[in-house]
Regions:
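Charge-dense, helix-prone N-terminal extensions
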Residues: 1-124
């Protein structure tokens, strides 16, 4: 079975640039990769797959989960958590969109008092 690659430092820096602005968000090593949490709730998890593709998972509004699944690659629905969606990361990743998705994930997982401190991106 192929090894899962470590998440490159440059990729971690890009994700940190987004999540480090969230109140009380903490980073920790996960069983594979790295995850970010608000208290005990995971808001994002980035990891390398056995296929050598890097992915990030996050939380989405329940109504949006089916839409992401329907879009297909680079999005995918996970087998755990009813509101967990994933995105395959590559050179074509839209980091502005990912910033919006991670912001939404934080706001879904954080207590209202903390979520209200975060400016959510405006949708045109």
């Amino acid at each position: 079975m192929p090894e899962r690659p470590d998440v490159p430092a440059a990729l971690l820096r890009r994700v940190r640039k987004v999540v480090d602005r969230f109140p009380e968000c903490t980073e920790q090593d996960a069983w594979i990769g790295v995850c970010w949490r608000i208290r005990q709730a995971t808001i994002a998890h980035v990891f390398g797959g056995e296929d050598q593709i890097f992915r990030i998972t996050f939380r989405a509004e329940p109504a949006e989960v089916a839409a992401f699944e329907h879009l297909g690659p680079p999005y995918f629905k996970t087998d755990w958590g009813s509101n967990v969606v994933g995105l395959m990361l590559d050179r074509d990743t839209d980091w502005r969109e990912l910033r919006e998705l991670l912001t939404d994930s934080y706001c879904l997982q954080a207590p209202m008092k903390l979520a209200s401190q975060v400016a959510r991106p405006q949708v045109p």
